[in-house]
């Protein structure tokens, strides 16, 4: 009986984790965190370095951050915002998104995935993403 109950609880936890990962409340599945550290001059802030790979047909939902995000395009691709013509986000270009300013919402429409290196300087202890509805 205990084994069955443990298995049931484990299954429910796995299901909840899967649902959480598939909803905007969680992290982006395309993002791989490389490093995270406290900002030495401001202990209530942290620096997060990540690589993201967004495949053809994948969409990054509109969101903002509790701090600044800066990035570099490692591999460019054609992207499209809703209601707009496709545009090239070129390899070697950079970007910066300011605190609490919604951005993204694009879909990769080119033949190759888009690869980004991002650095976030954000409020420590808060979620990295604030999803825009």
Sequence positions of predicted segments:
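A short, N-terminal "cap"/entry segment at the start of jelly-roll beta-barrel domains
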Residues: 2-48, 95-96, 129-133
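A short beta-loop-beta micro-motif enriched in histidine and acidic residues
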Residues: 44-45, 57-72
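Sec/Tat-exported extracytoplasmic proteins
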Residues: 51, 58, 74-78, 82, ...
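Short acidic-glycine-tyrosine-enriched beta hairpin
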Residues: 54, 83-101
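Structural recognition of the beta-strand scaffold that forms the well-ordered cores
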Residues: 62, 71-72, 94-97, 117-120
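Short beta-strand His + acidic residue motifs that chelate non-heme Fe in jelly-roll/DSBH
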Residues: 62, 80-81, 97, 103-110
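Glycine- and acidic-residue-biased ligand/ion/polar-headgroup-sensing regions
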Residues: 66-84, 93
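Ligand-binding loop in jelly-roll beta-barrel domains
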Residues: 101-126
């Amino acid at each position: 009986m205990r084994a069955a109950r443990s298995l049931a609880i484990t299954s429910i936890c796995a299901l909840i984790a899967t649902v959480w990962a598939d909803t905007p409340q969680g992290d982006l599945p395309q993002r791989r965190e490389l490093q995270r550290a406290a900002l030495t001059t401001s202990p209530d802030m942290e620096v997060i370095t990540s690589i993201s790979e967004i495949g053809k047909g994948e969409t990054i939902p509109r969101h903002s951050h509790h701090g600044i995000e800066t990035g570099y395009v490692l591999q460019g691709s054609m992207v499209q915002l809703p209601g707009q013509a496709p545009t090239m986000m070129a390899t070697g270009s950079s970007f910066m998104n300011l605190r609490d300013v919604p951005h993204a919402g694009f879909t990769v429409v080119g033949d190759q995935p888009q690869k980004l290196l991002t650095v976030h300087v954000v409020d420590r202890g808060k979620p990295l993403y604030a999803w825009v509805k």
